[in-house]
Amino acid sequence: MPRHYAIVPAAGSGSRFGAEKPKQYLDLLGRPLIFHTLAALTASPDIERVWVVLAPDDPWWPRYDWSELGSKLETVRCGGATRAESVSNGLRAAAMVAADDDWVLVHDAARPCLSAAMLDALFAELASDPVGGILAVPVADTLKRADAEQRVGATEPRDGLWQAQTPQMFRYGLLGEALEKCRDVTDEAGAIEAVGLKPKLVRGDSTNLKVTYPADLALAAMILRARK
């Protein structure tokens, strides 16, 4: 029976956030932001191991106590210049235990509000899927395309548009092959699409937000507090 593993690329600097440290280490309810991200994954009985892909020179990780997350957690200092490179390196680190037909969930370090229900939905809907898929939510807002002067150039129809989230879940062998061929993608689904396959969209939730700006951190704190 296929097993489930998770990879969390955490080598980014979070420059858009404008903080003194990478955003994955910013305080969120008394813990580093990434602690909450990893806690959601390590708490799942369906996930056997979680690899955190760090930058080779990351000075922040050793400053915190991660022991509460248990023995599933493993760090590898092989983060690359891009997300695709970091995930590919994480897949290589998993090669000693992962088989081609095992599932790999790739999850953003800066999505700390992933819930058990979201993971369960992903596992249930993709269990027998031939391709794999991603958590996503239908686009609710009206979309405007800007022109060169930052004026509205067009209003884009939102019918059928979804906003991609993570985790993104694909077979170990397939994902590795796709990323080897497609290095200029912004997410794993993009690599799968580039080799001619169609990932399934599994409805997520707006609370599964990605912390990108300071206001997002406050919102994530509200979401996590409400769950306690």
UniProtKB/Swiss-Prot annotation:
Which keywords fit this entry according to its UniProt record? Isoprene biosynthesis, Nucleotidyltransferase, Transferase
Q: What is its EC number?
A: 2.7.7.60
* Superkingdom: Bacteria
Q: Where along the sequence does the record put site: Transition state stabilizer?
A: 16, 23
Against PROSITE patterns, the record matches this protein to: ISPD
> Which residues make up the annotated site Positions MEP for the nucleophilic attack?
158, 210
The record's annotation in SUPFAM superfamilies points to: Nucleotide-diphospho-sugar transferases (SSF53448)
Q: Which CDD domains match?
A: CDP-ME_synthetase
Write down the chemical reaction(s) this protein catalyses: 2-C-methyl-D-erythritol 4-phosphate + CTP + H(+) = 4-CDP-2-C-methyl-D-erythritol + diphosphate
Pathway in which the depicted protein is active: Isoprenoid biosynthesis; isopentenyl diphosphate biosynthesis via DXP pathway; isopentenyl diphosphate from 1-deoxy-D-xylulose 5-phosphate: step 2/6
Q: Name one GO biological process term.
A: isopentenyl diphosphate biosynthetic process, methylerythritol 4-phosphate pathway
Q: What InterPro entries does the annotation carry? A: IspD, IspD/TarI, IspD/TarI_cytidylyltransf_bact, ISPD_synthase_CS, Nucleotide-diphossugar_trans
Q: Which GO terms describe its molecular function?
A: 2-C-methyl-D-erythritol 4-phosphate cytidylyltransferase activity
**Pfam families, A to Z:** IspD
Known role: Catalyzes the formation of 4-diphosphocytidyl-2-C-methyl-D-erythritol from CTP and 2-C-methyl-D-erythritol 4-phosphate (MEP).
Assigned protein family: Belongs to the IspD/TarI cytidylyltransferase family. IspD subfamily.
Protein name from the UniProt record: 2-C-methyl-D-erythritol 4-phosphate cytidylyltransferase
Which organism encodes this protein? Dechloromonas aromatica (strain RCB)
Taxonomy of origin reads: Bacteria, Pseudomonadati, Pseudomonadota, Betaproteobacteria, Rhodocyclales
